[in-house]
């Protein structure tokens, strides 16, 4: 049955992965979280990497949007606030480097 669906093009991991990444990026999730969820669903690492690479240009923009929406773009005033913001952004699936760049005001650096 599954083989028939695959042969007819009704089941396609590439299309599923594309749509999954697109949906999760729109929800404000980062590459780490998206990759982990796809791996849990049994998607091949190479396919995950290629789909995340296609969305790569927008990660910092997406991170800034999430940060502004949640924290109003306020730079942390103390260590405790910085840790709270960083924890939230890491939970959303962004890398430590990406989070650090946003919280240090260096989000535009490549």
Q: For each of these PLM feature ranges, what is it?
A:
Residues 1-110:
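An alpha-helical, amphipathic repeat domain used for nucleic-acid recognition
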């Amino acid at each position: 049955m599954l083989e028939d669906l695959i042969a007819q093009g009704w089941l396609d991991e590439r299309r599923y992965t594309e749509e999954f990444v697109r949906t999760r990026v729109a929800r404000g999730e980062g590459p780490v979280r998206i990759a982990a969820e796809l791996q849990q669903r049994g998607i091949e690492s190479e396919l995950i990497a290629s789909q995340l690479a296609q969305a790569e240009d927008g990660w910092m923009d997406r991170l800034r949007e999430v940060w502004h929406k949640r924290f109003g773009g306020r730079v942390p005033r103390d260590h405790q606030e910085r840790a709270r913001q960083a924890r939230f952004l890491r939970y959303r699936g962004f890398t430590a480097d990406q989070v650090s760049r946003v919280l240090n005001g260096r989000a535009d650096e490549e």
